[in-house]
Regions:
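N-terminal organellar transit peptides
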Residues: 1-117, 121-137, 141-226
Length: 226
């Protein structure tokens, strides 16, 4: 197999990864970075309705394991534009990203709403573009529930898991996150707060205002420092 054939095969494999999984391993720059996209709705134990763009957690988990175990991959970049989705699936992915030992960065583009917030803060460094937004609101549930105190306690425990994770991986306190989550003066017929990029940084939810070049520059610096 000659060099030209190898390049063609590598290009075809890269194209398939982007089309099928929304991922690519960037190997033509200074360092080898694995790029993972989280878009649309985060799909967990149940399939999303037809026509919705989704990120399937059963596709993402093996990619994160591979990024951790592959010695060629030096860093991880997670690009986010998500409306949220399954709470347990989102938290599972956030915990996995947080446990990757290699330099990692997240970049919020467009939106990082709901359970997308733990994902946005899960890496070593988080970035957000000025026009992106993040909606902080309480846990929701669709479908029939039992109207008993135990159900309410279950919701409270689930919310505490999210709040605790966000506080542990960002500069925002649990109290401030809860205050923003329960705010009633902003969303119509709902509670919560919408943060744009600058306010997300000001509130210490996100580390830095910036774009792709800023996130890659930080990753390169961390890789070289190691």
């Amino acid at each position: 197999m000659n060099d030209e054939t190898q390049l063609t095969d590598a290009g075809r494999l890269e194209k398939e990864e982007i089309e099928d999984l929304g991922t690519v391993t960037l190997a033509r720059g200074e360092h080898v970075i694995h790029c993972l996209t989280v878009i649309g709705q985060i799909e967990g134990h149940s399939e999303a309705p037809q026509g919705q763009k989704t990120t399937k957690y059963e596709h993402v988990i093996p990619q994160l394991v591979a990024a951790q175990e592959n010695p060629r991959i030096e860093g991880l970049l997670v690009l986010l534009n998500t409306v949220g989705g399954d709470v347990e699936a989102g938290l599972a992915l956030a915990e996995l990203i947080a446990s990757v030992s290699k330099p990692s960065a997240t970049l919020v583009l467009g939106g990082g709403h709901s359970i997308g917030i733990p994902l946005a803060v899960s890496a070593r460094r988080s970035f957000i573009v000025p026009t992106a937004t993040m909606t902080v609101h309480p846990v929701r549930h669709s479908g029939v529930i039992l109207g008993v105190p135990q159900t309410m306690r279950s919701f409270e425990q689930m919310q505490q898991r999210i709040t605790g994770f966000v506080a542990a991986h960002s500069g925002m306190t649990e109290k401030r996150y809860t205050d923003l989550m329960l705010h009633t003066g902003e969303l119509v017929m709902d509670m919560g707060t919408v943060l744009d990029g600058r306010r997300a940084v000001k509130e210490k939810l996100i580390d830095e205002l910036g774009g792709l070049s800023d996130a890659l520059a930080w990753l390169y610096k961390e890789i070289e420092r190691k």
